[in-house]
Design a protein with these regions (language model features):
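Flexible loop/turn segments at secondary-structure boundaries
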Residues: 60, 70-73, 122-124, 173-174, ...
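Structured loops at beta-to-helix junctions and adjacent beta-edge loops in soluble globular domains
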Residues: 54-56, 69, 86, 119, ...
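Acyltransferase donor/substrate-recognition loop-hinge adjacent to the catalytic core
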Residues: 142-213
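Short amphipathic alpha-helix that is part of the acyltransferase structural core
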Residues: 1-38, 190-213
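Acyl-donor binding region in acyl/amide transferases
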Residues: 73-161
Length: 213
């Protein structure tokens, strides 16, 4: 994979969603980290590959990635690989080419099933297909084109489980029950508890505290 192709893999969604105000662009570094063996521990027990699809005029019309995580695959009833980072123009033909490409690669490596859209490694980002509620997504939640559902279902993908995400306006009046406020007041009076605002100069310490929690 050349530097130019890696860059195009990241840049294509930015063009695809440029007129969609609800789309939140992932950090380039986060996407690259998924495919970097030095930053993704999943490579110690698996492998990943990614492709871009171009049209007759040479412009990118889609992208996809495929993964094999041996630990996750062994936990399934049959050898199962993963498909993710799927993005495509509104073209069923292009979508099926991407699906076929991932399927063939996985099949050649002994996989009998394909799960997607998923991520290679941690399952807190880039997991799932949004099928309802096309509003601005919460952190780490999937967002995609509405027509993706038709392509996945037409290809033969079936719903494995459903996941819901919700938004809550923390600035709204009575957003928390009164008992929560009483509990917070009670805890705040106990010795050993302090409240501090985030300080950029001590970002490492605050990050370490968050990780420990």
């Amino acid at each position: 994979t050349t530097v130019a192709l890696r860059r195009e893999f990241i840049e294509f969604p930015k063009r695809l969603y440029r007129d969609d105000p609800n789309w939140v662009c992932p950090l380039d570094s986060e996407t690259e980290a998924v495919f970097d063996p030095s930053r993704n521990a999943a490579f110690s027990h698996g492998e990943a590959i990614r492709w871009i699809l171009t049209g007759d005029d040479g412009t990118t019309i889609g992208r996809v990635a495929a993964f094999i995580d041996e630990e996750r695959s062994d936990a399934n009833r049959q050898p199962t690989g993963g498909l993710g980072f799927f993005e495509v123009i509104e073209s069923r033909e292009a979508a099926f080419i991407l699906f076929d490409t991932a399927k063939q690669w996985l099949s050649q490596r002994g996989m009998k099933a394909m799960d997607g859209p998923i991520n290679f490694g941690e399952n807190d980002n880039y997991w799932g297909l949004l099928v309802e509620g096309f509003t601005r997504p919460g952190f780490g939640m999937p967002y995609n084109k509405k027509y993706y559902r038709d392509y996945f279902e037409a290809y033969g993908f079936m719903t494995y489980f459903e996941q819901y995400s919700y938004h809550k306006d923390v600035g709204a009046v009575e957003v928390f029950p009164e008992r929560f406020k009483k509990i917070a007041e009670w805890i705040s009076k106990r010795p050993g508890y302090t409240y501090r605002h985030f300080e950029l100069s001590q970002s490492d310490k605050f990050a370490a505290d968050m990780v420990e929690i």
